[in-house]
Regions:
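Charge-rich, low-complexity N-terminal segments
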Residues: 2-7, 20-85
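C-terminal partner/receptor-binding element of secreted or periplasmic proteins
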Residues: 149-189
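Bacterial N-terminal signal peptides
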Residues: 8-18
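Intrinsically disordered and other compositionally biased segments
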Residues: 10, 23, 106-108
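Flexible, glycine- and charge-enriched loops at secondary-structure boundaries
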Residues: 58, 84-88, 153, 157
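Short helix/strand-capping turn motifs
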Residues: 88-154
C-alpha cells in the first residue's frame, strides 16, 4: 500500500516530467533560404552592397557586404541593430540557409534567435572554415551571441542550438559573443 507521502512524491515527479516535456517542446526550428537573387538591392557601389531579404513571420533580413565580409541583421530597424555592424574577422561569405529558433512560450511561435553558417577564408589553397553564428533576434537588442567552429566540433549544430536556446533570450548585447566548444578557425587570444 502506498502512503500519502509517497503518493504525493510520485505525483510531483509525474508533474515535473510532464511539464518538462512540454517545456522542451516550446522551442523548435524553422528555416529560410539565403538567396540574394530573391532580395531587394537597397544600395550598391564599388565598395559593397546591402540587400533586404524575406525572413520569417514578417521579420526581414538585412544582408550587407563590404570589404569581402558579410553582415546580417534582422527586424524592421535592422540597420540600427548591433548585428548590422558585426561580422567575422576573416573574409567570408554566407551559407544557404538560416535556422530560426522559435518559441511558443507566449502561445504563438515567435523567433528569438538565428543560426547562420559563415564560410571564412583560410590560408591559400586550404579548405574554408565554417562558423555557426548565433544571433539574438529582438527589436533593439539584435546581436551576435555565440560563435561555433563547425569543423572543430562534430556536434556543432547542437552546440549552436543550445547557445541559441540558453544564452540568446537573456544575452546583453553590450557583451562580446561567446566562443562555444573547440575553436580553431582563427586565433581568439
Amino acid at each position: 500500500m502506498i502512503d500519502g507521502l509517497k503518493l504525493g512524491a510520485l505525483a510531483a515527479v509525474c508533474v515535473a516530467l510532464a511539464t518538462g516535456g512540454a517545456a522542451a517542446q516550446q522551442v523548435d526550428s524553422s528555416y529560410t533560404n539565403v538567396d540574394l537573387d530573391e532580395c531587394t538591392v537597397i544600395e550598391a557601389d564599388d565598395f559593397g552592397a546591402r540587400w533586404a531579404c524575406p525572413g520569417l513571420k514578417g521579420i526581414p533580413v538585412m544582408i550587407a557586404e563590404g570589404d569581402l565580409r558579410f553582415f546580417v541583421s534582422y527586424g524592421l530597424k535592422s540597420t540600427e541593430e548591433k548585428a548590422a555592424a558585426q561580422t567575422l574577422p576573416p573574409f567570408n561569405h554566407l551559407g544557404p540557409r538560416i535556422e530560426w529558433r522559435v518559441s511558443n512560450a507566449e502561445g504563438h511561435w515567435k523567433p528569438f534567435a538565428t543560426i547562420l553558417r559563415f564560410f571564412t577564408q583560410r590560408e591559400e589553397g586550404e579548405e574554408e572554415n565554417q562558423i555557426l553564428v548565433v544571433t539574438k533576434v529582438q527589436e533593439g537588442a539584435t546581436c551576435h551571441v555565440a560563435y561555433i567552429d563547425a569543423l572543430a566540433n562534430p556536434d556543432a549544430n547542437e552546440l549552436a542550438r543550445q547557445a541559441a536556446d540558453e544564452a540568446a533570450p537573456d544575452f546583453d548585447c553590450a557583451n562580446e559573443p561567446e566562443f562555444v566548444g573547440a575553436f580553431e578557425a582563427w586565433d581568439i587570444e
